[in-house]
Amino acid sequence: MNNLSMYVPHIWKSELDSEATAFLSKYFPDAIKTPMCVPIEKIATEIMHLKVVEHHLSEDLSILGQMCFTDGMAEIYDPVNDEYREIFVKAGTMIIDPDTYAKRNLGSKRNTMAHESYHWFRHRRYHLMAAQLDNETRPVYRCPTVPKSESIQTEWTDEDWMEWQANNVAPRILMPIETVGAVYKKMATESMKNAFVAKGLRPQSEWIVEQTAGFYMVSKQAAEIRLKELGYLS
């Protein structure tokens, strides 16, 4: 273990919901009291005072977003000239690839914003200490689309662990454990008012997932995973 590893939060899988609750308790406690679409962009820009900008980050959307922890140069991709170049960024700048929304969906963009906001909330100290130890600026932490396999955790770096944390906490921020149950019950009740569901022409679970995703403004895949991990769907 290197000296920096002591600054990586040690979070068990069973503590991920508590992490999301801690984040929301600090920045937007109403979201754990009342079922709502968590206003993650407002949280990031107006409450955390992060600067959110859009730039392409890769040719193939392999990087969805990146968080800038110190002033310095950040690499972006210029699709017009098909080249990578650097731009100056200030600490607290969140860069989102516009294709996160254009080629995916709004839920993906919101999840990326929650992901990067969590990095700032929980991992900023690590990156600031790393900058001091290296005696250089470390402005950017780039977040890959495809996470590292959990089957090789023994080989993970500090960055891999922090990425795992952000990957798992972000959807929990957008769908807090404190409100998902109430939303599920509401959607389950309303589903029987849908003619196709009532007549057995459409699976009730499919309708519930779709409506829950719309309520929280997340992807249907994210909503289904969340409802299953909390035991509301089998």
Name the predicted role of every residue range:
Residues 1-234:
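Active-site hotspot residues in diverse enzymes, especially metal/ion-binding acidic/histidine motifs
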